[in-house]
């Protein structure tokens, strides 16, 4: 399959202008590409067809055929959709789309409101799930490795991108406190720590799995990595962390998966000369938490 370039899209646009006799407009155009060209490029870049995914990857809701301004967000929430429309985008690219295999297909409740907003706002919805987790340049896990100054060694199952999680080696060891501080700052989030925590403990060997990635530890009776960075953790994760001596950094599902999609948006904007609106929400950071120590009865 031929990979699209900005020059190829430019050639297509000039041909269209000549056919439609729109030469005066060529001097003042805003660049565009077809949505089919965008999804074809993303399918190949992210190797989307190599994954067994619950998500329907690619175009999920059709809007304008021409793409001039993209918005990127972690999830196709109503807030993200409204933000993209207000920014004047014609295409919203997300990690978590609206349509999943085996899920209730009825367009009712808030899902109806999301689709209604997309259609009325004339906004394409494009989603890539596991391909965005596993990509070694633009993926969620690769981004987590990058912000810590780490190099991706391989996938958790060597050579198997469908295992999603990655083994990471830091260029220089960092303390637990330093890693937590970097994650808080770069992801704009709160970080919870599980395991026998010593703030000055040095770490250089990590596993990373964005989103609900605690299964990397939950299912590994003898983990060989010092620490795991993930979005969510469950009850079993706590016990495995304590019993195996593995430290777990829990950064929040949304926070672990929203920056890489914006990085992908920057790449698309630069490559195809599109406008780009990155959407960022500090959901986990803004959620209030309580720990009330009192003898008072409630």
Report residues per predicted region:
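Polybasic, lysine-rich low-complexity intrinsically disordered segments
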Residues: 14, 20-21
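Active-site catalytic microenvironments in core metabolic enzymes, especially phosphate/sugar-handling
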Residues: 33-298
